[in-house]
């Protein structure tokens, strides 16, 4: 750190450093008005209120509680519930909470929701929603199975030719499969066979005829 010569001290012969202006940190002691307050002793943002769960939708993750004093319906979201794992409330469950205005302006909501004793965990609902399927099953028209693959990438059929997805045969397609006669109603099978015959006749009529010898 640079030093300068003070002109007003000892006829300009005393050396002076800006560090001389810093307080003596070694002997500095905190006074009561300088101490950092303990957050454990800070007052709560609002009074603690008490009520009961009116209803709670476990699938959507929200519901309402009824305040004991005002009988007001207060919105409650699962993210404000003091519990581990799947968070929900059981109908009629006793709770304590703070109250604040909702961010969307639609009334008030309960937050920091716990049991009747502040910080106590909640029991939660006995109903849990069914888990969502991780994959959607589609029917592959090449192998006929319900799976997550598509026909163009079917792992069950090794040939590029059309196959019957009812029985897997390469000799015919599903519309004229003998297995369908056994599994479906006779009138449905008859209609499908008639349609298949009509298509075959149209194909034969449109095919070029070869020259025949007399």
UniProtKB/Swiss-Prot annotation:
Residues 1-22, 178-214 are annotated as: Disordered. Keywords: Cytoplasm, Developmental protein, Metal-binding, Repeat, Zinc, Zinc-finger. CDD domains: CSP_CDS. Residues 48-116 form the CSD domain. A zinc finger (CCHC-type) spans 139-156, 162-179. GO terms for molecular function: enzyme binding; mRNA binding; zinc ion binding. Zn(2+) 2 binds at residues 164, 167, 172, 177. Zn(2+) 1 binds at residues 140, 143, 149, 154. SMART domains: CSP, ZnF_C2HC. It is found in: Cytoplasm. It comes from the Eukaryota. One of its GO terms (cellular component) is nucleus. Heterochronic protein which controls the choice of stage specific cell fates. Regulates the timing of the second larval stage events (L2 events) in the hypodermis. This is Protein lin-28.
């Amino acid at each position: 750190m640079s030093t300068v010569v003070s002109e007003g001290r000892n006829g300009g012969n005393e050396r002076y450093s800006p560090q001389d202006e810093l307080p003596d940190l070694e002997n500095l002691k905190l006074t009561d008005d300088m101490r950092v307050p303990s957050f454990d002793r800070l007052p709560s943002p609002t009074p603690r209120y008490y009520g009961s769960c009116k209803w709670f939708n476990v699938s959507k993750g929200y519901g309402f509680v009824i305040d004991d004093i005002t009988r007001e319906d207060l919105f409650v979201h699962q993210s404000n519930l003091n519990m581990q794992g799947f968070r929900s409330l059981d109908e009629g469950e006793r709770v304590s909470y703070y109250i604040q205005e909702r961010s969307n302006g639609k009334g008030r909501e309960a937050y920091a929701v716990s049991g009747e004793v502040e910080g106590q965990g909640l029991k939660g609902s006995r109903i849990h929603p069914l888990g969502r399927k991780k994959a959607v099953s589609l029917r592959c028209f090449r192998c006929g199975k319900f799976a997550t693959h598509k026909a163009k990438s079917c792992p069950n059929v090794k040939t590029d030719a059309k196959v019957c997805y009812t029985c897997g045969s390469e000799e015919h397609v599903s519309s004229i499969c003998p297995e369908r006669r056994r599994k479906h109603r006779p009138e449905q099978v008859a209609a499908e066979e008639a349609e298949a015959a009509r298509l075959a006749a149209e194909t034969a009529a449109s095919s070029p005829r070869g020259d025949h010898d007399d």
